[in-house]
């Protein structure tokens, strides 16, 4: 593999590990020319369905967009990067399991919301507010009330 720093073609694998969700192999590599280290990931290439946007245009499924939108919703929340990767892997699996060649962006948004709901309720509300285009505070209150009904009561934290 070519070194991203000096473009030399001779690199050695220093360490290999299976990722937490088992969907990738993480490799630490060292360049024999410049001695710098870098990380690579080996994943199975999947034929995921094309995404049909609201305007009818089609685009390739882009894992990075899903990760970026989840990271934005999870900003400053105590959720590990591995948990985000695992959630995106579950979304990809669900898309593959349908066997469909296309998926509507609305369906993809719902899958993301379902994963965020399991990871962090604050991130779920953040994402839902943008995805569902909340117009006023009452829509936030409705989502929060939905959570209160669905989950057992927890003692509130005082700051």
From Swiss-Prot:
Highest taxon in the source lineage:
Bacteria
What are its GO biological-process terms? negative regulation of DNA-templated transcription
Gene Ontology molecular function: ATP binding; DNA binding; zinc ion binding
Copy out the cofactor comment: Binds 1 zinc ion.
In Pfam terms, one family for this protein is Zn_ribbon_NrdR
Coiled-coil ranges (or none): none
Record keywords, A-Z: ATP-binding, DNA-binding, Metal-binding, Nucleotide-binding, Repressor, Transcription, Transcription regulation, Zinc, Zinc-finger
Kindly give the InterPro entries that the UniProt entry links to this protein: ATP-cone_dom, NrdR-like_N, RNR_NrdR-like
Is this entry keyworded Phosphoprotein? no
Q: Report domain ATP-cone positions.
A: 49-139
Xref: PROSITE patterns: ATP_CONE
Q: Which family does it belong to?
A: Belongs to the NrdR family.
- Function as written in the Swiss-Prot or TrEMBL entry: Negatively regulates transcription of bacterial ribonucleotide reductase nrd genes and operons by binding to NrdR-boxes.
Name the chain's protein. Answer: Transcriptional repressor NrdR
Q: Origin organism of this chain?
A: Burkholderia ambifaria (strain MC40-6)
């Amino acid at each position: 593999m070519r070194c991203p720093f000096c473009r030399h073609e001779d690199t050695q694998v220093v360490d290999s590990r299976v990722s937490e969700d088992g969907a990738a192999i993480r490799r630490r590599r060292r360049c024999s020319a410049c001695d710098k280290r870098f990380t690579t990931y080996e994943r199975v290439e999947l034929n995921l369905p094309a995404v049909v946007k609201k305007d009818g245009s089609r685009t390739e499924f882009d894992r990075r967009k899903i990760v970026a939108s989840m990271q934005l919703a999870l900003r400053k929340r105590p959720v590990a990067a591995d948990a985000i990767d695992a959630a995106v892997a579950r979304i990809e699996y669900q898309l593959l399991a349908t066997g469909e060649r296309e998926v509507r962006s609305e369906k993809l948004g719902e899958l993301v919301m379902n994963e965020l709901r399991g990871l962090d309720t604050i991130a779920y509300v953040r994402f839902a507010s943008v995805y569902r285009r909340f117009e006023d505070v009452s829509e936030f209150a409705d989502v929060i009330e939905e959570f209160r009904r669905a989950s057992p009561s927890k003692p509130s934290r005082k700051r």
